[in-house]
Amino acid sequence: MLIDEIKKANVEAMKARDNTAKGIYSIIMNKYMLLSIEKKQKGEEATDVDLITIISKTLKELTEEKESYLKVNNLEKANAITHQEELISKYLN
């Protein structure tokens, strides 16, 4: 499953001490786990399609956040968000 790939990428980010990558992977995993719990209560199971939806929404949130940082000329934060976008967008292909 796709979540397993993200978990593996999170472990690699931890080993590399890449806090930016670790942060975004953790966010994705937490959102997926919350959705998984909700679905289990309904007798359903979370799928890769659900995870792709989560990633898409997170990318949109990151884009909006990056635009805010660019408006106030905080390039360091904007660049970190660009890195996060690159990391998770590859899971949409």
Predicted stretch roles:
Residues 1-93:
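N-terminal cationic and glycine-rich segments that engage phosphates or anionic surfaces
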